[in-house]
Amino acid sequence: MTLTETPICNFGEKAKNFDLLSTENKKVSLKDIEGENGTLIMFICNHCPYVKAIIKDIVKDAKYLANLGIKATAIMSNDVKNYPEDSFENMISFSKLHNFNFPYLIDSTQQVAKEYAAVCTPDFFGYNKNLELQYRGRIYAARPTELGAAMKLIATTGKGPEKQIPSMGCSIKWLE
């Protein structure tokens, strides 16, 4: 397991479109998950201990953000051949076990992870209502959550915090 940090936020970078299969067996595009006040895209997986340690907080934050008009979604881009715990079937179980209140999508070609330049799980991308990147940091160091506070700021002002601490987690497991 390689500990990887996210790069500094590239403020204003536009969200890239995608069309991925959800654990609800529906195709989901960027337009489908666009929130009135912002959009949170999270790259996660089932096996990473960093994700497992915060998954309840991710679900709680997504519920909180929904009340602010921010929609969240999670994308799993890992190589499932070498990491079978991240298989689509296990994604379905993982999302049910943790009561996901947001779509959980599989990026089996890893094209979306590459387009977003995702590097680890978890990797958070917080966009304003114009789908401009405003947050690329960690969920928290202590309470209240930095992710929740950043997304609330984005929802109310359209801008993310200037100071951001990188998220850390397992590297994306790339196909060979």
Give residue ranges: language-model regions.
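Chalcogenol-based redox active-site neighborhoods
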Residues: 1-164, 174-176
